[in-house]
């Protein structure tokens, strides 16, 4: 999937719509109020990635050479026996490790959204 597709499907996983042209996330909060989050990009923003993981109840496991992300709850299309992972070089810089974590969170969220 392209980065745009990852963002579109990740937004869908949290019942929102991602506007590719403007980089805005549109949706409704739990009280039914409409909102628009300017510059939503969990591929680049730690806070956006964290909120995405929190909304979907994703677990993040860091190891010396990889990052594993799986779901606490069952989601259609996600095999609970097969967590998603991405390789991180041993002793890699924090900025690279953060990039790998964000990208893996978005990949899992996008897969959830794609299966909805």
Residue ranges and their predicted role:
Residues 1-116:
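Glycine-rich anion-binding surface patch
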